[in-house]
UniProtKB/Swiss-Prot annotation:
Disulfide bonds: none annotated. It catalyses: O-phospho-L-seryl-[protein] + H2O = L-seryl-[protein] + phosphate; O-phospho-L-threonyl-[protein] + H2O = L-threonyl-[protein] + phosphate. Expressed in roots, rosettes and flowers. Mn(2+) 1 binds at D60, H62, D88. Mn(2+) 2 binds at D88, N120, H169, H244. Binds 2 manganese ions per subunit. SMART domains: PP2Ac. Gene3D superfamilies: 3.60.21.10. This is Serine/threonine-protein phosphatase PP1 isozyme 7. Its EC number is 3.1.3.16. Keywords: Acetylation, Cytoplasm, Hydrolase, Manganese, Metal-binding, Nucleus, Protein phosphatase. It comes from Arabidopsis thaliana.
């Protein structure tokens, strides 16, 4: 994909900042190029990404394109900030195509600064049902959806930040004994109904569970705080960072701040009154949270930091600073 075409695609996608909800016109050829080129980059990079801070971590977006643009507006557009997204870019929201196309375009333009993990919705069996297939078919063709599927089958599934913070979309697996197992997962691959890859994208923490429990989703497991503590101790890690669940404040701790859930789609589906969040990891592994708030159903948002307390994780290398700042409202 030549630089001129890539820049043109990005510029057109960013023009939507002025008109939230505007459909961006991209050609079928441009979308195919985004998929083919990014697919090659995903396969050249490892399935377990090894990244260095500073980096900003974002959770589910689900086709809420105006909210993705707001995240960049306040976190800094690439390459001014490094990003790691935890998956679930498509389905449910109105603009899955704009969302995934901008993310793939940034991946191509800044392959060493911009990283995308796979979520459970980056799977043909799921996004065939929950909106992405229909959006592709309505705006382009079923063939385009299949090309996206080939691209999604090559996405990495986990990341390790400075050997301390372990990131994935869903959660842990009873089969996960060594990070080498993730490196050894071969791509391209669909997401199986069970096993390590399935669990990394589907499992959930549960405060009422000790050990492993059944999952109400009908897929994978739930796991308790004891599983989190044991896993971190065994692999000498400090924090698990995942997405996959709507949380009211955009982020939510579990297991005495050894795990954090990040969800970046505020007012999810227009049905939840949740905030969205982004976690910033500084060079010294200080973690802070920026909040994109949903104030009402008409999508007025405020963006600021959350809290007013300083707390430390059990291991000294990773800290959480929840600094208090005045929130600013954005229409």
């Amino acid at each position: 994909m030549d630089p001129g075409t890539l820049n043109s695609v990005i510029n057109r996608l960013l023009e939507a900042r002025e008109k939230p909800g505007k459909i961006v016109q991209l050609s079928e050829t441009e979308i195919k190029q985004l998929c083919f080129v990014s697919r090659d980059i995903f396969l050249r990079q490892p399935n377990l990404l090894e990244l260095e801070a500073p980096v900003k971590i974002c959770g589910d977006i689900h086709g809420q394109y105006p909210d993705l643009l707001r995240l960049f507006e306040h976190g800094g557009y690439p390459p001014n900030s490094n990003y790691l997204f935890l998956g679930d870019y498509v389905d449910r929201g109105k603009q899955s195509l704009e969302t995934i196309c901008l993310l793939l375009a940034y991946k191509i333009k800044f392959p060493e600064n911009f990283f995308l993990l796979r979520g459970n919705h980056e799977s043909a069996s799921i996004n065939r049902i929950y909106g992405f297939y229909d959006e592709c078919k309505r705006r382009f063709s079923v063939k385009i959806w299949r090309i996206f599927t080939d691209c999604f089958n090559c996405l990495p599934v986990a990341a390790l930040i400075d050997e301390r913070i372990f990131c994935m979309h869903g959660g842990l697996s009873p089969e996960l004994l060594s990070l080498r197992q993730i490196r050894d997962i071969r791509r391209p691959t669909d997401i199986p109904d069970r096993g390590l890859l399935c669990d990394l994208l589907w499992s959930d923490p549960d405060k009422d569970v000790r050990g492993w429990g059944p999952n109400d989703r009908g897929v994978s497991y739930t796991f308790g705080s004891d599983i989190v503590s044991g896993f971190l101790k065994r692999l000498d890690l400090d924090l698990i960072c995942r997405a996959h669940q709507v949380v009211e404040d955009g982020f939510e701790f579990f297991a005495n701040k050894q795990l954090v859930t990040i969800f970046s789609a505020p007012n999810y589906c227009g049905e939840f009154d949740n905030a969205g969040a982004m976690m910033s990891v500084s060079e010294d592994l200080t973690c802070s949270f920026q909040i994109l708030k949903s104030n009402d159903k008409k999508s007025k948002f405020s963006f600021g930091s959350r809290g007013g307390a300083k707390t430390s994780f059990p291991y000294p290398k990773v800290k959480s600073i929840l600094s208090s700042q005045n929130s600013k409202e954005y229409n």
